[in-house]
């Protein structure tokens, strides 16, 4: 093939991509009413992500600790309050009973939220392709505010912990936090170029870590000083603020269609077409494999996160609220270190190998945490996980690049659905595995999680080699050295 022909082909491809990008830009910027207010800073959905994550991370360990305290009162256990939590009480039957009850109630609450929110996430995410992204940010924020209000009612009136499940279901009816994730990542896909998408996604995920770090530090100290109620008032206010910000400041990227209906089978059909179409050839298999990797990585992350507080509360660590807050802050600090590491590694490594480094960091950290019997060793495990979030931005970006611009909403709706499934599976597996393995190895679930991560590592490595080989063959076919 002549060099002139090669140049013409590449120019034509570039022109078609540019024209498609231009069309996309016009589609998302014209004929839409601007928000009531304009933000002077060059940010869009980042504050929504930050505020929603702040509320979730602030309430999650407090809910677990509240369940622990309420269930301890029910069975008459007061080991952590009287200083009885030490190495000699590892086999205390009351402590084991409280751990088991707390793990099971966490399972029931997460299961209830998942079953209700599963289909709502798909509906809301795909619906946003026609109705607009802002609604998918506002509705779940209001649902999370209702959940916080129910939790406050339980604490004020000392209602049975069953009412926590009711609050979780209320949040699930609005799409829960996963709908906010879907809306935010679809928004970034609308407004970013292919070359910069991985880093833009990583910035959005860094908002998760920054908010989580602040919430963890504040939550532990605040709960120790004033109990549970005041922090949950902040959770309520934060969710309302997120909804208000999305309404006032976030520009719309999709022209709203007045005919768009939320409850329609077309949303599920769009997702089915996305995963059944094999044009271009090979796309479908890559899409399924990357979704499988994403499912396994997020399942391990959520499953282990659910157990950290239980693991730290009981012997031999016996952490109080302050140390639990610092531990959660250290875990969320890894979001920021992962962002920095990802940016640095992109200078010399392809995205697939960046993801492998992140998975390796995660596996090593989990193994150390599984044998942690001192505070120093536990924080060492957290420190070794400093790149553990480098893999998920790569996976989201690769999935986004496999589909057309008009399919981004359906894609991230399905990804959000997978995240909901991850929440269910992680709760079912890890919260059941933890009490079942207490008698022979307390940290076994973390070793199990590290072993599971070997699967996505192998898949990502294999696909990375295949993509590199295909890229080399394409260059040779065009006569490009």
Swiss-Prot record:
It is found in: Cell membrane; Apical cell membrane; Basolateral cell membrane; Endosome membrane. SUPFAM superfamilies: MFS general substrate transporter. One of its GO terms (biological process) is transmembrane transport. Keywords: Cell membrane, Cytoplasm, Disulfide bond, Endosome, Folate-binding, Glycoprotein, Membrane, Symport, Transmembrane, Transmembrane helix, Transport. It is a multi-pass membrane protein. The keyword Ligase does not apply. Residues 1-45, 129-132, 175-197, 248-286, 346-351, 397-408, 462-481 are cytoplasmic. Proton-coupled folate symporter that mediates folate absorption using an H(+) gradient as a driving force. Involved in the intestinal absorption of folates at the brush-border membrane of the proximal jejunum, and the transport from blood to cerebrospinal fluid across the choroid plexus. Functions at acidic pH via alternate outward- and inward-open conformation states. Protonation of residues in the outward open state primes the protein for transport. GO terms for cellular component: apical plasma membrane; basolateral plasma membrane; endosome; endosome membrane; plasma membrane. GO terms for molecular function: folic acid binding; methotrexate transmembrane transporter activity; symporter activity; transmembrane transporter activity. This is Proton-coupled folate transporter. Residues 65-102, 156-160, 224-228, 310-322, 372-375, 435-442 are extracellular. H(+) binds at residues 176, 205, 301. InterPro entries: MFS (IPR011701), MFS_trans_sf (IPR036259). Monomer. The chain crosses the membrane at residues 46-64, 103-128, 133-155, 161-174, 198-223, 229-247, 287-309, 323-345, 352-371, 376-396, 409-434, 443-461. Glycans are attached at residues 78, 86. It catalyses: folate(in) + H(+)(in) = folate(out) + H(+)(out); (6S)-5-methyl-5,6,7,8-tetrahydrofolate(in) + H(+)(in) = (6S)-5-methyl-5,6,7,8-tetrahydrofolate(out) + H(+)(out); methotrexate(in) + H(+)(in) = methotrexate(out) + H(+)(out); pemetrexed(in) + H(+)(in) = pemetrexed(out) + H(+)(out). Belongs to the major facilitator superfamily. SLC46A family. The lineage of its organism: Eukaryota, Metazoa, Chordata, Craniata, Vertebrata. Disulfide bonds join 85-318.
